[in-house]
């Protein structure tokens, strides 16, 4: 099911909880234009809490891909699974960070393990985090970025 994230995740939460999460139904939900990307349409279209709402439900996987390539890989991955899943995708077109050959990982590292700054990002904001990483490294800081595409299950081993 594809729908604006503000309506899919929040207004339909009770149905998702009962009909998808509790029953373990093989349902894939895609929340488009989530967050505040519908800005001019007002607060009724904002959905900053959609990931938190869906992630609070048992048995549902939650993904927030950073670009079109990663979105394609996430969709292929969840279609091979019978677990319920929610994907949050942004509204804006962003430059690809990944290539079609890159493998999907719950948390993708960029840069060497840092002794200084560690950035963690997901979704559309990863583009800005990549730029921040470059600036930090150019300024001589030891910095790295983890792109957390999988929020549930969360890859805490890579983070730690």
Task: Please give the residue ranges for each predicted region.
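Conserved thiamine diphosphate
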Residues: 1-118, 143
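Generic recognition of short, well-ordered alpha-helical segments
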Residues: 11-15, 130-131, 157
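Short, surface-exposed alpha-helical segments at coil->helix boundaries
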Residues: 48-51, 126, 130
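A general structural motif
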Residues: 96-106, 118-129, 148-157
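Short helix-loop-beta junction
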Residues: 128-146
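N-terminal small/polar loop signature for handling phosphorylated ligands or for N-terminal nucleophile
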Residues: 160
């Amino acid at each position: 099911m594809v729908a604006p994230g503000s309506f899919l995740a929040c207004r339909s939460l009770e149905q998702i909880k009962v009909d998808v999460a509790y029953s373990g139904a093989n349902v894939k939900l895609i929340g488009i234009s989530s967050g505040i990307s519908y800005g001019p349409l007002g607060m009724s279209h904002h959905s900053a809490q959609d990931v938190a709402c869906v992630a609070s439900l048992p048995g549902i996987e939650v993904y927030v891909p950073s670009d079109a390539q990663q979105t394609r890989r996430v969709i292929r991955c969840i279609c091979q699974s019978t677990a319920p899943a929610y994907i949050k995708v942004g509204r804006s077109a962003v430059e690809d960070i990944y290539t079609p050959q890159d493998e999907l990982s719950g948390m993708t590292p960029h840069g060497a393990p840092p002794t200084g700054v560690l950035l963690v990002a997901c979704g559309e904001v990863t583009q800005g985090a990549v730029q921040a990483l470059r600036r930090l490294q150019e300024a001589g800081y030891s910095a790295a970025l983890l792109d957390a595409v999988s929020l549930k299950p969360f890859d805490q081993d890579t983070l730690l």
